[in-house]
Amino acid sequence: MSEVNEETLRAREALAGHYKEVLGLLGEDVEREGLLKTPERVAKAMQFLTKGYHEDPEAVLRSAMFQEEDYKQMVIVKDIDFFSLCEHHMLPFFGKAHVAYIPKKYITGLSKIPRVVDIFARRLQIQERMTMQIKDCIQRTLDPLGVMVVIEAQHMCMQMRGVEKQNSLTTTSDFTGFFQQAKTREEFMNLIKHNR
């Protein structure tokens, strides 16, 4: 278990004070038993849910980057579960990311792709930007022949409030290089279909 540094603890304490104030402004009795530790719990949870601000996704990819000049086909990591927070309402959105790249000179450890997804998801986000950030990070770091990212997500800000559409699913995609060719994109989309 990693140690929590002083700066993190100070920030957590300040956040907890603000959350206590929010609870009071909502009309709650902040001294009732069930809420006594809630501000600290929420502060700790928010630090975890936004820890991606303090992590370097390019360093994660570089930590397991290997030269491989022979393999020139798609590498796909699909059905990567993620949770994020919408920057507009700070409500969760969650779903699956599907990521592919076509190596030119380098490959990366397979576990590094989900880690990159998590780093960008653990920030206040919008799905469209998260899709682009994952694509751009892989393209910049591995310099492959192409990258494609598809994200499918449910947004609690659409399900719990607003239009209240509980079964809606939002899909975003972005791509570079060889994935600009319709045939390559079609191959990727066929490979990530959920026909198990």
UniProtKB/Swiss-Prot annotation:
Source superkingdom: Bacteria
UniProt enzyme class: hydrolase
Binding site for Zn(2+): C86, H89, C157
Alphabetical GO biological process terms: one-carbon metabolic process; tetrahydrobiopterin biosynthetic process; tetrahydrofolate biosynthetic process
One GO cellular component, as annotated: cytoplasm
Substrates-to-products reaction catalysed: GTP + H2O = 7,8-dihydroneopterin 3'-triphosphate + formate + H(+)
SUPFAM superfamilies named in the record: Tetrahydrobiopterin biosynthesis enzymes-like
UniProt signal peptide: none
Pfam families: GTP_cyclohydroI
MF terms in GO: GTP binding; GTP cyclohydrolase I activity; zinc ion binding
Keyword annotations from UniProtKB, A to Z: GTP-binding, Hydrolase, Metal-binding, Nucleotide-binding, One-carbon metabolism, Zinc
Family under the similarity heading: Belongs to the GTP cyclohydrolase I family.
NCBIfam families the UniProt entry points to: folE (TIGR00063), PRK09347.1-2 (NF006825), PRK09347.1-3 (NF006826)
Name assigned to this protein: GTP cyclohydrolase 1
Organism per entry: Parabacteroides distasonis (strain ATCC 8503 / DSM 20701 / CIP 104284 / JCM 5825 / NCTC 11152)
